[in-house]
C-alpha cells in the first residue's frame, strides 16, 4: 500500500497487530472509496441523460479514451516503483513462471468454461460472455491489487508482460476451442465464433500495458540518474504514489457510468451472471494462493501469483463481446458485470492477503 516503503516488496511478516495499522487514510478506507466510486458511477449513468453515449463516443480504434486515461494514471505510479534491474531474479524463478502460465492459460479458462455451463446452462448469451471474460487474462488492474497487497512488484511486471504476449498469441485460438470446438465435442450444442484479430488484441495490450510500462521504466531510469536511487525512492515515489488510487477510482466511475443504465435495468440477470463470477474469483485466488504456499514461494510472490490468476482484462472482454455480438447483447452484459463483481471481491481479497501475510515465515525458498 502507499504507506509501505517504495523500495520494493516487503518479504517479512507484518509486525502490526492490525492489518490496517500504519496505513494512510486513502489506503485504510479503500473499500469505502471504491464503493462510493461504483455508486457514483452507476448514479451518473442512470440519472444523467446521454452521458453513457457521450463517454462511449470518445474512443479510438474501439478503445475508450477516458478508461485508457484512468488506467494510465492508475498503473504509471506502480510501474515507476518497479526496480527493473531486478527482473532477472523473477524470470529465473521457474516455479513462479511455470505456475503462473499453467494457472492463467490452462486452469483459468477451463474453470470459467465449467462454471459458465454449470450456472448458466439455459442462458447461452450470458454463458458465452462469461467464457470470453475467462479468456481475457489480466494485464492492467492486477498491478494495483498486487501493490496494495504488498506483492512482488517486479514479479507482477514480468507476469503481466508474459500474459500480454500470450493474450496476443492465444486469445483467438482459445476462443475457438472453448466456444466452438469443445461444446460440439461434448455434445453441448452449436458453438460460437469470435470476430477479433490479433492486431486488435495487440492494440489493446499496447494501450493498457505498453504505454504505462514504458513510462514507468523511463521515469525510473532518468529519475535515478538525477536523484540517485535513494532520492528517487524516498522523495519522488511518495509524491506520485497516491495517484494510482486516484486513477483507479476515476476508472471505476467512468466504467460504471458507461454501463450504469444496463446494470440497473436488469438486476435479476446481473445476479445470475454474478454467481459464477463469485465462484470463479474465489476458486482462482484461493487456489493460486494455496499453490504458491505449497510450492514454497515467499508471501510477496504468492500474492502476485494469486492476483494475476484471479484478475481479468475486462476492457478486452467487453470490447470483444460488443464487436462480435453487439452492444445490447447478453454477451456484452456479462462482460460489464465482470468488473462490477471483480473490483469489490479483489479489494476484499487484498485484506485477506494482508491478514495471511503474517502466517509466512521469513527466508522461505522460492524467492
Name each region found by the language model.
Residues 1-80, 85-309, 314-367:
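Alpha-helical transmembrane segments of multi-pass small-molecule/ion transporters
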